[in-house]
Amino acid sequence: MSTIKVTDADVQETIQGNDLVLVDIWAPWCGPCLALAPVLEEVAKENPNVVVAKLNQDENPGTAQNYGVMGLPTMLLFKNGELVDRLMGNQPKPCLLYTS
């Protein structure tokens, strides 16, 4: 599966409707966010049991604010609708695989 785009309007539906969801909160001006994007695509394709959802913080500030996001990129891992882990900054693929 490829990554999916989510918004403030539908992110909760995605989180609640799937067992494992990794929400990548990013921005188009964020260099580390852009560097992380292909790694997240690989994680999504190699782990069909994990939904990798990308949320543009500039267009959707509500979710970032609700989860207290202070820096980008921030990845939030949800299991059965509950936040279970948080990663900040550009992460190597092994860290993302361990989290998911």
Give names to the regions the model predicted.
Residues 34-46:
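Typically the conserved alpha-helix immediately C-terminal to a functionally engaged Cys/Sec
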Residues 4-20:
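A short beta-strand-turn-helix
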Residues 30, 98-99:
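Conserved small/polar residues in nucleotide/adenosyl-binding loops
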Residues 73-86:
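A short, hydrophobic beta-strand/beta-hairpin element that forms part of a small beta-sheet core
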Residues 22-23, 52, 75:
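Hydrophobic beta-strand anchors of alpha/beta hydrolase catalytic cores
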Residues 19, 26-29, 71:
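Short pre-active-site segment immediately N-terminal to redox-active cysteine/selenocysteine motifs
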Residues 6, 41, 48-61:
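Thiol-based oxidoreductase modules, predominantly thioredoxin-like and allied folds used
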